[in-house]
Design a protein with these regions (language model features):
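Short aromatic/basic micro-patch
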Residues: 16, 74, 98, 106, ...
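Cyclic nucleotide-binding regulatory module and flanking cytosolic helices
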Residues: 1-36, 80, 85-86
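Cyclic-nucleotide recognition modules
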Residues: 73-131, 135
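Phosphate-/nucleic-acid-contacting segments
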Residues: 149, 160-235
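Cyclic nucleotide-binding regulatory domains
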Residues: 13, 38-101
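Polybasic "coupling" helices that flank or enter modular domains
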Residues: 99, 117-187, 200
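A generic structural signal for short hydrophobic patches within well-formed alpha-helices
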Residues: 22, 112-113, 218
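Structural motif
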Residues: 57, 101-103, 178, 209
Length: 235
């Protein structure tokens, strides 16, 4: 099992920081364990710090007045979440839940701001991560508002390919129900689209592994799903 220092030093948010600073960051971190399905924080809870996934997986989501859940993002090992309140001192804008047994490193806001004051390079790292997060949410809004579900799915599969550093296949690390919520659709629609992609020779699915048979076709679909016969009218 990786040590807290190894996890911190391997995280993008702390990339390039010298060993002494990493040790100081480790000293303010608090290790917290969560069971599958356990809530980490609720929307409107006071943002008194942020988290880094050491082990497991966490989903960030919102719930509509009717009870419909919309997953906004899923974070795995080495990824931070809940960073915005560190700077704003405001409340969390969404909910966070462990979707598998997880261990998180929690960084209290007051202690972390003290480190940022002492080490401006840490602030630059935080800004880089926040900038990346903004781009991710911009792409997500674009996908949900302008693209049909097949294009959203193709774009997400290609995104996972980049994240997992694999050209020919990816491994789904969340359930199909969770993937459907992330894409703004329902499991039945997602299953139909996956089946059509299989029949058209774009992909081959086996359990949680999806092999790319026609990557160019996926790239084309991700850009303009409306011109592809995979388009679904159902949300």
């Amino acid at each position: 099992m990786a040590s807290d220092l190894d996890i911190i030093s391997g995280a993008l948010i702390f990339d390039g920081l010298p060993g002494k600073q990493l040790e100081q960051i480790k000293d303010v971190a608090i290790s917290k364990n969560y069971t599958r399905g356990e809530i980490i924080f609720m929307e409107q809870d006071m943002g008194n710090g942020f988290y880094l996934v050491a082990e497991g997986m966490v989903k960030i989501f919102k719930v509509s007045p009717s009870g419909k859940e919309q997953i906004l993002h899923v974070f795995g090992p080495g990824e931070p979440f809940g960073e915005v309140p560190v700077f704003s001192g405001k409340r969390f804008p969404a909910n966070a839940e462990a979707i598998r047994k997880s261990r998180l490193l929690f960084f209290p806001r007051t202690a972390f701001l003290g480190l940022i004051t002492a080490h401006p390079s840490l602030a630059l790292n935080m800004l880089a991560v926040l900038s990346m997060r903004l781009r991710q949410f911009t792409h997500q809004i674009e996908n949900l508002s302008l693209k049909e579900v097949p294009a959203r799915l193709a774009a997400y599969l290609l995104y996972l390919s980049t994240e997992q550093k694999r050209e020919d296949f990816i491994t789904l690390d969340i359930s199909k129900g969770q993937l459907a919520s992330l894409l703004g659709t329902i499991p039945e629609t997602l299953s139909r689209i996956l089946n059509r992609m299989n029949k058209q020779g774009l992909i081959e699915t086996k359990d949680r592994t999806i092999r790319f048979l026609n990557r160019e076709g996926l790239e084309s679909l991700s850009i303009d799903g409306k011109k592809n016969e995979l388009m679904e009218k159902n949300p």
